[in-house]
Amino acid sequence: MNFLPKSRKARRRLTILAVAAPVVALAVGLALWGMRDAISLFYTPAQAAAAHVPAGRKVQLGGLVKAGSVVKHPDGLVEFVVADQRSTALVHYKGDLPDLFREGQGIVASGAFDESGTFVANQVLAKHDERYMPREVAKALKEQGEWRGDGQAPSYQGYKPGKPNT
């Protein structure tokens, strides 16, 4: 019983397909493997807590800076809490904050969680006017049913400075 096509043209096409398919699959696999460190997933604090993001994994954390949570240390370390009404995350950032960074406003921080669950940011991006919300933050808030299109800052109940509510 012969499974190969009878015509020479069909056998040639099958041979080319049998050689090309694994080569293309290998190329796509290598490209994705090479980009694994460049891919940065976006989470809100609640999503990060639910997903149990492993320590050291590069992610973006977005939400609103909780009022009264910003602490600037003499060594240049800035500590603040990012919240999304369901959960909060403590963020440490060493460096200069954007000029538009302020409490009650939306931010997106890039970095990784450490072993203690603190988000260590290497970059902080702030919204640029009263009406703008970073796309990822707005989408996440809409999915959670917490979106406020009127620009009002949400109120946070039960917040204690220095300790994130999770």
From Swiss-Prot:
* InterPro entries xrefs: CcmE (IPR004329), CcmE-like_sf (IPR036127), NA-bd_OB-fold (IPR012340)
Reading the lineage from the top rank, the first entry is Bacteria
Specify the protein's topology with respect to the membrane. Answer: Single-pass type II membrane protein
- Transmembrane regions listed in the UniProt entry: 14-34
Q: Where is this region: Disordered?
A: 143-166
Q: Where does this polypeptide localize?
A: Cell inner membrane
Q: What is its main location?
A: membrane
Where, in residue ranges, is this chain on the Cytoplasmic side? 1-13
Keywords from the UniProt entry: Cell inner membrane, Cell membrane, Cytochrome c-type biogenesis, Heme, Iron, Membrane, Metal-binding, Signal-anchor, Transmembrane, Transmembrane helix
Keyword DNA repair in the entry? The reply is no
Give residue spans on the Periplasmic membrane side: 35-166
Q: Name one GO biological process term.
A: cytochrome complex assembly
Q: Which GO terms describe its molecular function?
A: heme binding; metal ion binding
Query: What Gene Ontology cellular component terms go with this record?
Result: plasma membrane
Residues that hold heme according to the record? 128, 132
Q: Give the protein's biological function.
A: Heme chaperone required for the biogenesis of c-type cytochromes. Transiently binds heme delivered by CcmC and transfers the heme to apo-cytochromes in a process facilitated by CcmF and CcmH.
User: What is the similarity comment for this entry?
Assistant: Belongs to the CcmE/CycJ family.
Question: What is this protein identified as?
Answer: Cytochrome c-type biogenesis protein CcmE
Which organism's genome codes for this protein?
Caulobacter sp. (strain K31)
